[in-house]
Curated annotation (Swiss-Prot):
InterPro entries: T_IF-3_C_sf, T_IF-3_N_sf, Translation_initiation_fac3_CS, Translation_initiation_fac_3, Translation_initiation_fac_3_C, Translation_initiation_fac_3_N. It comes from Rickettsia conorii (strain ATCC VR-613 / Malish 7). GO terms for biological process: ribosome disassembly. SUPFAM superfamilies: Translation initiation factor IF3, C-terminal domain, Translation initiation factor IF3, N-terminal domain. Its main location: cytoplasm. The gene is infC. Belongs to the IF-3 family. The keyword Isomerase does not apply. This is Translation initiation factor IF-3. GO terms for molecular function: ribosome binding; translation initiation factor activity. IF-3 binds to the 30S ribosomal subunit and shifts the equilibrium between 70S ribosomes and their 50S and 30S subunits in favor of the free subunits, thus enhancing the availability of 30S subunits on which protein synthesis initiation begins. Keywords: Cytoplasm, Initiation factor, Protein biosynthesis. HAMAP family: IF_3. Monomer.
Amino acid sequence: MYLFINIIRRHFISKNNFPKANREIRAREVRLVGENGEMHGVVNIREALDMAERAGLDLVEISPNAVPPVCKILDFGKFKYESKKRLHEARKKQKIVVLKEMKFKPNISIGDFETKLRKIKEFLKDGDKVKISLWFKGREILHKEVGQELFKRIEVGLEGLVKIDQHAKMEGKQMIMIVSPDIKVQ
């Protein structure tokens, strides 16, 4: 039973995402591009394989969805290496944006406010978005204007550093504002 499953896996699951090369190409005719980029036009697959063998290189299917498929004569090992290297570089350059949260209360002291504001600036310098939430407890929710004033103080403290994605608005018992780093400043 285990052997049977392995055979099915090998048949249906591709081990890599690289294009087909040489004898794996199933088309009868291909649009051939030479090793230096010169176009040879539509050629029989056997002729294309012969040309690749004579050059000591591989025939690689570049665009399988085209009619006929586009194939290029090149060194397949080098092609795979460069593809992996490009993919690795692209992943390295990707920046995952994280949403950090900073919670405030309406009656926050000046020292705590400045500390939290400094921490928000650190998050923004790291390139993260920040969700600033103001939690109301009990009867504090009756004084929403205190929350609005607090958010105005936050905006003044972060002026020039941020782009406001979502202005202060109520969600249940909390007031929320979302800011992200301003690209112009960085």
